[in-house]
């Protein structure tokens, strides 16, 4: 247990959400001495922003001097502490996020969807989310040569969008 990475989460009031308070500073000092992460989060703010649409949420977060909601920070830090990453699959009807361990090979990642995908894995059409956003269209990105064919030894990267080719 002592070798596990830990994250300390301090629930603070709204006015302390960006800079913390005297109690969160004590926790920060301790955590830093142990090389651990500290996240300050206001449950009250998180509750309020859960009721807002995206534009209102962003405006409210900015008005508080925060970069992003505390819950987003907690999720990202949690993924990091657990060595997890996310890849996506997308089709005409749905886009789905899949959680995997970092450095998972493409066939094992495909196996998260269905074991037949792992057994019959051939290749994966792959583009990173940030590259796709530049083109705003999968076909345009593919035409520009940004979609890669990756094989069995490819380590899936956080934010990859993948279309698996496999034999049944």
In which residue ranges do the predicted regions lie?
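C-terminal-of-GTPase-core extension/linker across diverse P-loop GTPases
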Residues: 1-157, 167-168
């Amino acid at each position: 247990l002592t070798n596990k990475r830990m994250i300390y989460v301090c629930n603070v009031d709204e006015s302390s959400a960006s800079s913390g308070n005297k109690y969160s500073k004590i926790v920060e000092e301790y955590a830093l001495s142990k090389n651990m992460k500290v996240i300050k989060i206001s449950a009250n703010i998180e509750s309020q922003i859960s009721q807002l649409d995206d534009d209102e949420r962003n405006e409210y977060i900015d008005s508080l001097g925060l970069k992003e909601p505390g819950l987003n920070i907690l999720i990202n830090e949690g993924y990091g502490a657990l060595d997890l990453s996310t890849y996506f699959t997308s089709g005409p009807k749905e886009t789905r996020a899949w959680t995997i361990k970092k450095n998972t090979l493409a066939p094992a990642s495909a196996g998260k969807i269905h074991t037949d995908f792992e057994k019959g894995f051939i290749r994966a059409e792959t583009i990173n989310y940030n590259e796709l956003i530049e083109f705003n269209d999968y076909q345009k990105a593919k035409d520009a040569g940004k979609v890669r064919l990756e094989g069995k030894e490819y380590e899936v990267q956080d934010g990859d969008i993948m279309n698996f080719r496999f034999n049944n």
